[in-house]
Amino acid sequence: MIQMQTVLEVADNSGARKVMCIKVLGGSHRRYARVGDVIKVGVKDAIPRSKVKKGAVMRAVVVRTAQGVRRDDGSLIRFDDNAAVLLNNQNEPIGTRIFGPVTRELRERFMKIISLAAEVL
């Protein structure tokens, strides 16, 4: 469950390390984002000479949450961290590699992230 001021890890090679959620997109007063939701983030930490600079405001999709994802069969998939993948304005990932596992719930809207990920749960 991601809300404003939540700090997330970045799960791609765009150059950002940590981002902070500044807005949950998709509704006028939407409070929480789950896996697969698009959020607006500010870059808090980035590696030098990368595609993304510290202070940049970007879009991101949530790929892992510590709260987890409840499946239709009743199973719950939880992760150790909250992580996101940075997107451009066309909702395509900026990075060319995805680190760590992602969930099947991204398949409908973000097939490119599924194909780049090493492990899909």
UniProtKB/Swiss-Prot annotation:
Which keywords fit this entry according to its UniProt record? Ribonucleoprotein, Ribosomal protein, RNA-binding, rRNA-binding
Q: Which GO terms describe its molecular function?
A: large ribosomal subunit rRNA binding; structural constituent of ribosome
Entry annotated with the keyword Ribonucleoprotein:
yes
CDD domains per UniProt:
Ribosomal_uL14
Decide whether keyword rRNA-binding is in the record.
yes
**SMART domains, sorted:** Ribosomal_L14
Q: Name one GO cellular component term.
A: cytosolic large ribosomal subunit
Xref: InterPro entries? Ribosomal_uL14, Ribosomal_uL14_bac-type, Ribosomal_uL14_CS, Ribosomal_uL14_sf
Its BP terms in the Gene Ontology are: translation
Which Pfam family is one of this chain's hits? Answer: Ribosomal_L14
Self-association and partners: Part of the 50S ribosomal subunit. Forms a cluster with proteins L3 and L19. In the 70S ribosome, L14 and L19 interact and together make contacts with the 16S rRNA in bridges B5 and B8.
Its family? Belongs to the universal ribosomal protein uL14 family.
Looking up NCBIfam families in the UniProt record yields: rplN_bact (TIGR01067)
Query: What does the record give as the function of this protein?
Result: Binds to 23S rRNA. Forms part of two intersubunit bridges in the 70S ribosome.
Name the UniProt record assigns to this protein: Large ribosomal subunit protein uL14
Gene that encodes it: rplN
